[in-house]
Amino acid sequence: MEQEKQEAPVQGKKKRLSTPLLIFIILMAVTAVLCAIVAGIWLHGRSSLRNGGTAPTVTPGGTEQLDSYTVLHDGKYYRYKEHMVNLLLIGVDSDNKPAAPLPYGSDNQADVILVAALDTDANKMTLISVSRDTMCDIGVPDDTGEISGVAHTQLALSFSNGDGLYESCRLCREAVSQLFYGLQFDGCAAFYMGGIGRLNDAVGGVTVNVLDDYPFTNVPGGWNMYPGQNVTLTGQQARLYIQARRGDATGNEDRMQRQKQYMLALIGQAKARVASSPASVLPLYNAVSDYVLTDLDLGKLTYLATQAAGMSFSGDMLRVTGQAALGDGNRVELTVDQEALYDLIL
């Protein structure tokens, strides 16, 4: 991800962007165009993002930290790439972005968690999907926002422990950072999932081949969503398709497959619409702008907007793997394969 092996990389075919990242880039691009950013802001954004010192600070047993940028792991040397930008992208299980901070401990959870690693030298981007059910240590704040303890629980709850806005993003960001051996993030963006329906309809609907893992036809609005059927989803159906899940040990894993399928289809539809009519970027922006929260300033947004246009993926979207089981209260708990996670980070 943000470290490199001391050997030539293998090139793969390009992959399309994920839904939260597409939304994020649409916002960045429109912001840059509408604000007519001058070169000085672009240079400031580049400087602040490319000098963040984002290398992981913790190493597992059997790994030797040789210096701030180099580790020896399983007999191979890995060196941190200095021009990486690491972003955390969060899909929030909420209809709307709160107009003001909520009391700590609100019910908004992080349903989608993605780590985006941008190599600004190689113009390559890597996405890593982290299950909401991942068991990890998260900070527990008191009524004033001060951290009063630590709980080992689902990653999704890190967001709900906060205020539904920036403090929730911070708590989720810190939990993922600790999970990823101290990896630091240059920015965070949250998308409130109530905007999925509006975005879906703004691109003219999204067609998927319905996967056979959930009884959609038994749910209001899912009358035509039969397994194996090609269906152009309405906004209501799109949200149902990417949010509904069974309550068993594999329910979230199956839902993540549907989310990935929908993301790819949505991106194809959005790209086709923008290619045929560049002005359609503005309606897409208007459709989702009220549902996005980010801590990136204008300079960083502008720099990322210009960089993202030429970036591609190498390989599939990666996933943090582990063993899922039902825990207390029939809650799904995913115990991470720590060795596989560190190999993934490398």
Q: Where in this protein do the model-derived segments appear?
A:
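Non-catalytic, solvent-exposed segments at the cell envelope interface
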Residues: E2-L17, L21-M28, L34-L346
